[in-house]
């Protein structure tokens, strides 16, 4: 990326991004490099498959055009972000030629939660910072963002595969949120056992452990009622607040997708076994 003149930075989840957080300058710089290397670009051409003679067919501004190259590399993307052209419309074209495909699904996406009206109205858009998120033994130290429909952000995307697996297996999945990742249960219990007098439990949590706002709302959401008074029970809840995931956000809102060309449809060189000379690359696999 930096070789293209675009400064990069690594985010908290280990992903690398353009420093300006825009992809278009990176794309323009890459296209210039390709053209400087002799590549000829044909914009506004939409691939339509093959004709009876095996030539590639495109819809172009001047009408249908064909090409019969010695080799073809397909890099057609997944099935999200339709407005930018990534719609997965190529999958039936390959399937018709006998190439194995897998149904598309969302990846690196938001997830649905049946929040109470209180959470939707008061905390939609709020980040839950400095927490540990876990799903079925996989975990990440990060943050998540509450949305009107559920949860999203980098920490959620890191666990998206595990969440999707749980949804496929059980119909729902459970995201556990450790609100106090730097404290163990005994340390939390010691704080909770301090006299609170006439303070409410919410005030006691705020003053003794700094748990307030959206974090406190997640606690109440988990119990859907009165918080437990027993220090050990409450401490364990603080270390593993369960959030019931009921589904994924719509496919077209996903950052990327699973599915596409099946791995067993390709040889070691990523050539389609059913279509010699046709190779696949990128998210379409």
Which ranges hold each PLM region?
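Hard-cation-handling environments
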Residues: 283
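Residue-level recognition of phosphate/Mg2+-coordinating polar/acidic sites
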Residues: 3-14, 71-75, 81, 132-278
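General small-molecule cofactor/ligand-binding pocket signal
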Residues: 40-42, 102, 279
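Acidic, Ser/Thr/Pro-rich intrinsically disordered regulatory segments
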Residues: 112-144
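A conserved short coil-to-beta-strand element within the FAD-binding core of flavoproteins
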Residues: 40-55
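A short alpha-helix-loop-beta-strand transition element characteristic
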Residues: 4-16, 38, 98-107
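Glycine-rich loop(s) and the adjacent beta-strand/alpha-helix scaffold that form part
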Residues: 71-117
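Short beta-strand to alpha-helix junction loop
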Residues: 13-32, 41-42, 81-86, 112-116, ...
């Amino acid at each position: 990326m930096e070789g293209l003149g675009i400064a990069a930075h690594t985010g908290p989840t280990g992903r690398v991004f353009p420093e300006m957080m825009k992809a278009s300058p990176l794309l323009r710089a890459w296209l210039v490099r390709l053209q400087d290397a002799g590549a000829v670009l044909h914009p506004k051409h939409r691939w339509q498959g093959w004709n009876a003679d095996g030539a590639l067919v495109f819809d172009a501004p001047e009408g249908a055009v064909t090409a019969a190259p010695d080799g073809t590399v397909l890099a057609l993307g997944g099935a999200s972000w339709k407005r930018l052209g990534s719609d997965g419309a190529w999958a039936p074209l390959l399937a018709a030629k006998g190439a194995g495909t897998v149904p598309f699904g969302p990846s690196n996406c938001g997830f649905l939660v049946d929040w109470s009206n209180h959470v939707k109205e008061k905390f939609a858009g709020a980040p839950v910072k400095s927490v540990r998120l876990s799903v079925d033994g996989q975990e990440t130290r990060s943050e998540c963002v509450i949305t009107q429909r559920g949860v999203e952000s980098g920490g959620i995307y890191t666990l998206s595969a595990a969440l999707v697996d749980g949804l496929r297996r059980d119909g729902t999945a459970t995201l556990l949120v450790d609100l106090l990742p730097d404290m163990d249960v005994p340390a939390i219990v010691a704080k909770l056992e301090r006299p609170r007098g006439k303070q409410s439990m919410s005030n006691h949590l705020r003053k003794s452990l700094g748990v307030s706002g959206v974090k406190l709302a997640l606690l109440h959401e988990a119990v859907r009622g009165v918080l437990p008074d027993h220090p050990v029970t409450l401490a364990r809840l603080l270390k593993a607040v369960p959030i019931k995931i009921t589904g994924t956000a719509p496919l077209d809102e996903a950052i990327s997708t699973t599915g596409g060309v099946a791995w067993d449809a390709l040889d070691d060189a990523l050539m389609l076994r059913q279509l010699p000379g046709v190779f696949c690359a990128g998210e379409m696999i």
